[in-house]
A protein has these predicted regions:
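C-terminal binding/interaction regions
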Residues: 2-22, 70-145
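Short, well-ordered amphipathic alpha-helical segments that serve as non-catalytic structural scaffolds
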Residues: 12-15, 57-65
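Short beta-strand scaffold segments in enzyme catalytic cores
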Residues: 28-35
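Alpha-helix C-terminal capping segments
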Residues: 34, 63-70
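Compact, glycine-rich, soluble single-domain proteins
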Residues: 45-56
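Short amphipathic alpha-helical face segments that pack within enzyme cores
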Residues: 56, 60, 91-94
Length: 145
């Protein structure tokens, strides 16, 4: 991952965490994605009293970028108030994996604990086999730069 973006990406994820709507479990999570154009988009988890209606921070950040016309991501950061860095859930890994197919390359994943300790990985390491749009023969070229 390009070091010049690392701090900005983590800071954006931390801001996202502060905006989280974690009304059920008081467990705010923030995320931020870095696009191949160098833009950063943040997201946060939101919860609802209706089961299944919440949104994870990672998907929120990706959807924020998509709403702004960005589809190609190089990295994503995830932060929470726990000292131990948390990993994206399975649903978020699938979502990130599908966008790695759009990008045509691996997506770096930074997991950051509240004390600043960072665990690094990538979507290919965390979800090495993915069923995604390419398996359905979908042409993703219109979403690339």
């Amino acid at each position: 991952m390009d070091e010049r973006y690392r701090n900005d990406l983590v800071t954006a994820a931390e801001v996202g965490m502060k905006n989280a709507f974690a009304i059920l479990n008081n467990f705010p999570v923030g995320a931020a994605v870095l696009t191949s154009r160098g833009q950063i988009y943040q997201g946060c988890n939101t919860q609802s009293v209706i089961s299944g209606m919440g949104v994870c921070a990672e998907r929120s950040a990706i959807d924020h970028a998509v709403a702004c016309g960005e589809y190609v991501f190089d990295a994503i950061a995830v932060v929470s108030k726990l000292e131990v860095p948390i990993a994206p859930c399975g649903m978020c890994l699938q979502y990130i994996g599908e966008f790695s197919q759009v990008a045509g390359h691996d997506i770096h994943i930074l997991m950051v604990g509240s004390t600043g300790n960072i665990r690094e990985s990538s979507i290919q390491k965390m979800l090495p086999v993915i069923f995604g749009p390419l398996d359905l023969g979908i042409d993703l070229s219109r979403f690339r730069l």
